């Protein structure tokens, strides 16, 4: 049986993650309030930010920036986007 959560990002009941994505309170919050779909969307966006902004995950400031953008992404605030990116039209 698939576990569902009331997704903070999409404001609907959706399948949740199988386990917290990382340890601690932040991981538990994501596990309990973020859907699999929202997490997958964040992973794609995070990869784009790391590549386009040339973020170095060994750098504490870059990790802090990415953490802040993740919080904005999930809460519905305006978050950083890759400059010049145009999503493909369907």
Curated annotation (Swiss-Prot):
Statement: the UniProt record of this protein carries the keyword Iron = yes
Q: Which UniProt keywords apply?
A: Iron
Q: Which SUPFAM superfamilies match?
A: YggX-like
Q: Which Gene3D superfamilies match?
A: Fe(II) trafficking protein YggX (1.10.3880.10)
Q: Which GO terms describe its biological process?
A: cellular response to oxidative stress
One GO cellular component assignment for this chain's record is: cytosol
Recall the GO molecular function terms of this protein's record.
iron ion binding
Transport among keywords: no
Residues spanning the membrane = none
Q: PANTHER family per the record?
A: FE(2+)-TRAFFICKING PROTEIN-RELATED
Outline what the protein does. Answer: Could be a mediator in iron transactions between iron acquisition and iron-requiring processes, such as synthesis and/or repair of Fe-S clusters in biosynthetic enzymes.
* Family statement: Belongs to the Fe(2+)-trafficking protein family.
Q: What is this protein called?
A: Probable Fe(2+)-trafficking protein
